[in-house]
């Protein structure tokens, strides 16, 4: 059964495909070690939420999730949404990311990363992102803004 790429089902299926690609093709790679899981996607709001589990190896010296891990999870989530919104026909490397750490993210618990598209352009996509503990979804622990360069793999006709 075919469906439109730009639809609720199309978005969910494509994001799940990206996650499977990371887990299968990047075995041992950093993104695969983060092990993202799709929690929700909302085509109308142009946003998605991925879950990550804060493994003990992700700790900083204070015994909480390292800020670099949280930044990488935000980047990966915004980047996946950017690739989807670029119609999957290109790569969208990070051009800039700004991260604000508000509260610690505990280890050995799930945290959720929600990315929302603010601007989708021909050459740049911009997103906002928030990270929350899955047990306290109303308390943002981290916020981020990311800009992604849209590099088409082939020219539009």
Annotated model-derived regions:
Residues 44, 55-58, 76-78, 107:
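Short, charged/polar surface micro-motifs in flexible loops or helix N-caps
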Residues 54-62, 70:
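A short interface-forming secondary-structure element
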Residues 33, 45-49, 96, 110-112, ...:
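Intrinsic-disorder/low-complexity, polar/charged segments enriched in Ser/Thr/Lys/Arg/Asp/Glu/Gln
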Residues 68-88:
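Active-site helix/loop of acyl-thioester processing domains in fatty-acid/polyketide metabolism
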Residues 39, 100-102, 114-118, 132:
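Conserved positions in beta-strands of structured domains
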Residues 1-51, 56:
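Non-catalytic linker/capping segments at the edges of enzyme domains
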Residues 81-112:
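Hydrophobic beta-strand-centered segment that forms part of the acyl-chain substrate-binding groove
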Residues 1-16, 105-107, 118-157:
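HotDog/MaoC-like acyl-thioester-processing domains
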